[in-house]
Regions:
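Tandem CBS (Cystathionine beta-synthase) repeat/Bateman regulatory domains
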Residues: 1-152
Length: 152
């Protein structure tokens, strides 16, 4: 198990080319298209720089489609107004400043973040916060399963 805990993120992560992402100014329709296939998408400032600025998930959809009369969430002391309209962009509904990790961090570091922040995935970024990939609990489980099956 020690070898597993010391494994670097870069050895397990899914590379950026294989993960869902969109620009922060993407429209509501693009967001819904992406989320109808995947449970999340990383949000980057633009496709040239690829700096991670947020994440959109199924929970973000839920937060924004619940009728105002059923919402428990309050912002600035008042109930939020519906944000679903054609002009809505991903930046309006995403979770800002997601928890991130570097490719040099270890599985132990990632597990601590998953536990501390009660999350299931992390964006893997370089020192300039550019998206390199992602690591998920599911990936760690698959890696651990592989190790158990292939060691005697």
């Amino acid at each position: 198990m020690e070898e597993f805990y010391n494994t670097k993120v870069k050895e397990i992560m899914i590379p950026q080319r294989d993960i869902p992402f969109m620009e922060e100014n993407a429209g509501w329709v693009e967001f819904l298209d992406r989320l109808s296939v995947r449970a999340h998408a990383w949000v980057v400032n633009n496709k040239e720089e690829m700096k991670v600025v947020g994440i959109v998930t199924e929970h973000d959809i839920l937060r924004n489609i619940i009728p105002p009369t059923h919402r428990k969430i309050r912002m600035f002391g008042i109930h939020r107004v519906d944000m679903l309209h054609k002009e809505t962009v991903v930046q309006d509904i995403m979770t800002h400043n997601p928890v991130i990790c570097s490719p040099e961090e270890t599985v132990t570091d990632v597990l601590k973040k998953f536990s501390t922040f009660n999350i299931r995935r992390l964006a893997v970024v370089d020192e300039k916060k550019r998206l390199l990939g992602e690591i998920t609990i599911q990936l760690l489980v698959k890696d651990l399963r592989y190790r158990f099956r292939n060691t005697e």
